[in-house]
Amino acid sequence: MNQLNHPYHLVNISPWPLATGMGAFAMTSGLVKWFHSFDSMLFFTGINNNHICFDQWWRDVSREATFQGMHSTKVGFGLRWGMILFIISEVFFFVSFFWGFFHSSLSPNIEVGALWPPSEVESFLSALLNTSILLASGVTVTWAHHALMENNFDQCLQGLLFTVLLGLYFSFLQGLEYMEASFTIADSIYGSTFFLATGFHGLHVLIGTIFLMICILRHAKCYFSQHHFGFEAAAWYWHFVDVVWLFLYLSIYWWGE
């Protein structure tokens, strides 16, 4: 079948979709355990499993594209549309969280004292810093992309490194914010909507950071050419994460407070 005269890429059997699904199941199950005051070992085991699977899966895709020549013009067109539709699906995923937040905040019920935010909920001063960090990371990833198009190896590498460091710093500050919060996910609808929306965004930041780390490894090995959709997809995803955070900041942290 792989020798047929057609422009499509018939992929070989791969263990990574199944292994990634098992890791995702371990993550979600471990998160439920963690929320109910059990240990967090299963959750972090799932994270480590998925990190390894992402690394190996991207390695295979890079080999197919760079060394085996499997990504024809038709395949590249399909990959671009696949990434666009994936980001659109993620937009609607976050729309559900914003819907839940505004549904609860515009007409708070008696369970939260008919107040929004509920009493005893303190504002977060780190949110504005996180916003500036993500906006700066959007600038650095754009800088890296333009440097790549201009065949400037060093500036592209610097831009990618700065973007990854800013993403890791954002995740670190988000973790500190969660630890210092005066409420939990179990504290009323406010806690549920806050931690679900910001937590899933934080997960997307981690995924985008891993995506950019893979781009650093590929760039260091000189895999990128004038055809570098892997880098473009990472940049699209990172800008999507930036825009979602702007809406989260304006809705939950600024207007919601």
Curated annotation (Swiss-Prot):
GO terms for cellular component: mitochondrial inner membrane. One of its GO terms (biological process) is mitochondrial electron transport, cytochrome c to oxygen. It comes from the Eukaryota. It catalyses: 4 Fe(II)-[cytochrome c] + O2 + 8 H(+)(in) = 4 Fe(III)-[cytochrome c] + 2 H2O + 4 H(+)(out). Keywords: Membrane, Mitochondrion, Mitochondrion inner membrane, Translocase, Transmembrane, Transmembrane helix. Component of the cytochrome c oxidase (complex IV, CIV), a multisubunit enzyme composed of a catalytic core of 3 subunits and several supernumerary subunits. The complex exists as a monomer or a dimer and forms supercomplexes (SCs) in the inner mitochondrial membrane with ubiquinol-cytochrome c oxidoreductase (cytochrome b-c1 complex, complex III, CIII). Belongs to the cytochrome c oxidase subunit 3 family. Component of the cytochrome c oxidase, the last enzyme in the mitochondrial electron transport chain which drives oxidative phosphorylation. The respiratory chain contains 3 multisubunit complexes succinate dehydrogenase (complex II, CII), ubiquinol-cytochrome c oxidoreductase (cytochrome b-c1 complex, complex III, CIII) and cytochrome c oxidase (complex IV, CIV), that cooperate to transfer electrons derived from NADH and succinate to molecular oxygen, creating an electrochemical gradient over the inner membrane that drives transmembrane transport and the ATP synthase. This is Cytochrome c oxidase subunit 3. The gene is COIII.
